[in-house]
Amino acid sequence: MSTNLRKTHPLVKIINNSFIDLPSPSNISAWWNFGSLLGACLILQTITGIFLAMHYSPDISLAFSSVAHITRDVQYGWLIRNMHANGASLFFMCIYLHIGRGLYYGSYLYKETWNTGITLLLLTMATAFVGYVLPWGQMSFWGATVITNLLSAVPYIGNTLVQWIWGGFSVDNATLTRFFTFHFLLPFTIMGMTMVHLLFLHETGSNNPTGLNSNTDKIPFHPYFSYKDLLGLILMLAFLLTLTLFYPNLLGDPDNFTPANPLSTPPHIKPEWYFLFAYAILRSIPNKLGGVLALLLSILVLFLMPTLHTSKQRTIQFRPLTQTLFWSFIANLMVLTWIGGQPVENPFITIGQVASILHFLILLILMPIAGVIENKMLT
């Protein structure tokens, strides 16, 4: 009798060991669904993105009208465009929930998996930023101007760096064409990095809600988790379609329906909702370089999570002190997101500064201390 092709064929074997016969902990909850949902988001964004690229013109005189042309004249262009725009929001919702799961259950102790994951977050943020510039509306143009301008805070080479990225002395045609190039290229680097992320994950196997070793109790990925993930996928698609078909512009900025005009600055320049927390931290520091560093560190601080883990237990599941801090951290992020969308005036400035300090205080100081206290409570 010949052996199963699924287990012997060099190519199929990889797929089999990753998605079919993969030994998985029997007790992983729905919080472990987000990895596959992110994969689905990436595929969806790539497909809708390629179809949009077929009809888009990366030129400042054509970009805005080519997007209007897609939504008006292309078959189902309105659907493809709205799914792509709202798919990005969904992508970030899943990313943030996925990272939150990792923080809660101590998944960051798989260092390589965690570090590749944070790298994926940074790549996705870069992709979303350059993508937002492409429709060439007011917020596209001014968002690009403000964010690229932050690089001028780099000592000595700052101004040269900004002009090099712009391809001139302001955000212009050269900027748009290169941003289109990056927006097309980066998702493929994300795919490559995702492979590396999974490679490292499958070296150790998944973590589970208890944070204990689950080698004694593994079940095959298929049919158990393939169907469990399918349920998550159906729910996610239902949510995406509801958003796309009923409230397509709910998360967008009305300013982006006005073509880019370098002579008129919008009253409130702000990024999409998924960057607002970082934008609030950037604005909270009354110094350009300081703000840029705080902005970067607010995300890069995640790289330190494995180093800052002081507890004898892996998850926060059974640690009331750290649990309180974790949920305070989440609430604080929501406050930052709200502040990022508000004008720069009191009381928002003060609230933003307090929330920015808390963001770093909780992660870098309070959580490690809580871990030590909880260890003492155990002994």
Curated annotation (Swiss-Prot):
In the bilayer, the protein is annotated as:
Multi-pass membrane protein
The cross-references to InterPro entries, in alphabetical order and at most eight, read: Cyt_b/b6_C, Cyt_b/b6_C_sf, Cyt_b/b6_N, Cytb/b6-like_sf, Cytochrome_b, Cytochrome_b_C_euk/bac, Cytochrome_b_N_euk/bac, Di-haem_cyt_TM
One Pfam annotation reads Cytochrome_B
Q: How does it assemble?
A: The cytochrome bc1 complex contains 3 respiratory subunits (MT-CYB, CYC1 and UQCRFS1), 2 core proteins (UQCRC1 and UQCRC2) and probably 6 low-molecular weight proteins.
Obligatory cofactor(s): heme b
> What CDD domains does the entry give?
cytochrome_b_C, Cytochrome_b_N
Q: Please report the name of this protein according to its UniProt entry.
A: Cytochrome b
Tell me the residue numbers annotated for binding heme b b566.
Answer: 98, 197
Q: Does the keyword Iron apply?
A: yes
